[in-house]
């Protein structure tokens, strides 16, 4: 029962969507550093390829870019087929692709709802559904469940102060979808979500540029999330030590859900 075996993901095949930068890159980097073969996909092909090359150079695992627009149904299906064609199975799926949209209540556009609910919820379902055969083959080959990790948000748990109406609603929906999926995939696949607090990413840039010091001081941990914080949580859920955890929403937030003033 040593830690190195409980949290080993060496040799695992993983797919991290939105893996070209931000939180997705943080998770992919953690996987590669611990010996996994990681596929990353995002709409920004240049960022995707650059990240894959950099992570492979760091090793000891490897990283492969498969660019695609994961807001589109056809691109999700094509990505799933490409993974099956290359590997025949999948051990870990991290659904991280997402977007946000902020505007006042009076000016909040209808387009925000279409964009965010499609990318943040519907396409998570689309891709997970399309990859079920590969995930089931991964479980059969390893003798342990394959893992699905959905990247949610503390905004899906507590009501945020900022006017990100469609975003917070989409993350609450994603958390509920996580639990619903976990109840349907049985013992061959676990499904969990990470409800993230503030991390340095493109999505959080404007907020952190304006409020980083105040936000950090409002958290019990008095700092913004670091790459190793989210990578460690994903590795835990992906390794043998996380095998009996499913249908759970795990806050990785420095205590953001504890204090009301820490809400974004």
Tell where the protein language model's regions lie, with residue ranges.
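Short C-terminal tail/terminal secondary-structure segment
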Residues: 2-5, 235, 246-264
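Conserved glycine-rich cofactor-binding loop
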Residues: 13, 18-22, 44
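Short, small/polar-rich loop/turn modules that mediate ligand/substrate recognition or access, typified
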Residues: 94, 186-190, 245-247
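Active-site helix of classical SDR
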Residues: 128, 170, 178
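Alpha-helical segment proximal to the catalytic Tyr-Lys
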Residues: 133, 182-187, 243
């Amino acid at each position: 029962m040593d830690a190195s075996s409980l949290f080993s993901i060496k040799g695992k095949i993983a797919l991290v969507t939105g893996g070209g930068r931000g939180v997705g890159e943080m998770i992919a980097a953690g996987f590669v550093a611990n010996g996994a073969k990681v596929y990353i996909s995002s709409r920004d092909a240049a960022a995707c390829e650059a990240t894959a090359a950099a992570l492979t150079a760091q090793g000891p695992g490897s990283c492969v870019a498969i660019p695609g627009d994961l807001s589109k149904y056809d691109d999700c299906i094509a990505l799933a087929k490409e993974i099956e064609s290359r590997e025949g199975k999948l051990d870990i799926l991290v659904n991280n692709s997402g977007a946000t949209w902020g505007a006042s209540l009076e000016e909040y556009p209808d387009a925000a709802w279409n964009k965010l609910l499609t990318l943040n919820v519907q396409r998570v379902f689309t891709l997970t559904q399309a990859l079920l055969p590969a995930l089931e083959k991964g479980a059969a080959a390893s003798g342990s469940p394959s893992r699905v990790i959905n990247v949610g948000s503390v905004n899906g748990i507590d009501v945020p102060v900022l006017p990100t109406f469609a975003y917070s609603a989409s993350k609450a929906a994603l958390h509920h979808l996580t639990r619903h999926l976990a109840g349907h995939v049985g013992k061959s696949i676990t499904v969990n979500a990470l409800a993230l607090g503030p991390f340095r990413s493109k999505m959080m840039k404007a907020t952190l540029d304006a409020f980083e010091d105040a936000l950090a001081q409002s958290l019990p941990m008095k700092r913004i999330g670091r790459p190793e914080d989210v990578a460690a949580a994903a590795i835990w859920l992906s390794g043998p030590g996380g095998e009996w955890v499913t249908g759970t929403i795990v806050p990785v937030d420095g205590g953001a859900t504890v204090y009301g003033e820490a809400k974004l």
